[in-house]
Amino acid sequence: MKTWDAVIVGAGVIGLSLGWRLRREGLRVLIIDKGEPGRESSYAAGGMIAHCDPHLPAALKPLTFASAAMYPEFVHELQDESRESPDLRDQGTLAFCHDGELLDCEGTRVAAKDEIVRVEPALTQPPLGVSAYWLPERSVDPRALCNALFKAAKHRGVDVVTGSAVTDVEVASGRVAGVKTASSNYPAATVVNCAGAWASQIEPLGLPTRPAKGQMVCVVPAPGDMAEAPVVEHVVRTPEVYIIPRSDRRILLGATVEDAGFDKRTDAETVEKLYRAAVKVVPKIGEMRIHDAWAGLRPASPDKLPILGETSLRGYFAATGHYRDGIMLAPLTAELMTQLITGARLEFDLEPFSPLRFS
């Protein structure tokens, strides 16, 4: 029977990044997913690498800054191996914040009204009590990113099993021995639960994640407007909506945060609300047409911090619970979990994110 050094449960951006990274260290890696790679939370994400967000938990900020800084090299290596572009954009973010919100991110500066008019002429001016800032942030297309990660992992020799849900983590002599699906057993000395919102469903030691639903909308230019200049060049973030331009002229509008269990349906009222909020900021979006709407299930932990590290079962690790920051944290998560699994020196103290904090 074939064996692996590590089995990763979940082929989202976290599982794919970790599998690719572990394989580069020489480990024999298997990734198992209940569906298709990158088709759950990662597929639904907006892709903002928003390390300057003032609402990030303080404990998470050092990790977000480090992971955001890793992105250019991460994508460069990924493109070399996959021959696919994840559409990494570095135009930056224009953020409208309520006065008094602290924006202490290096490189942030106030956006003057005349500058906004010159750089983003389609935008309305911020209302009274709201300030505008330029943030040194990037964005990426998560669907293209996961496609590139899947191809790079396969290129490296990572095994991937799709359409097969892991039901149990197998245990022998007090440590992990592999995983079990309805039809097969997969032996490994290391197992990593990267199953996102579904991480709690894998026994034993189900991790305390729950789904946090987020609805998003995609608008595209009318057929006759495709040759015109893009409506916006920068990511635009307000307290009510964020607007994310893609290089192919699509614009994403998001997003809700809902406690709706595993329900991934969209509703017309929410789609219309997001659309109207975007039109209020960028009136020309009203001339575009709604192309698609979808919902994803973010993996939320009880304290909204990621769950990273070894569980109480030797050899059984967790890398989940990234909530709204999985895309941003993927490069660093893969690096830190690889360091932990291979016994290398850790760049960051992972104790605040340990699965054992919920014991």
Q: Which sequence ranges carry the predicted segments?
A:
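Dinucleotide-binding Rossmann-like beta1-alpha1 core, especially the glycine-rich loop
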Residues: 47-122, 128-129, 277-279
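C-terminal catalytic lobe of FAD-dependent flavoproteins
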Residues: 142, 282-359
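Glycine-rich FAD pyrophosphate-binding loop
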Residues: 23-44
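Short beta-strand to alpha-helix junction loop
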Residues: 62, 99-100, 132-151, 265-270, ...
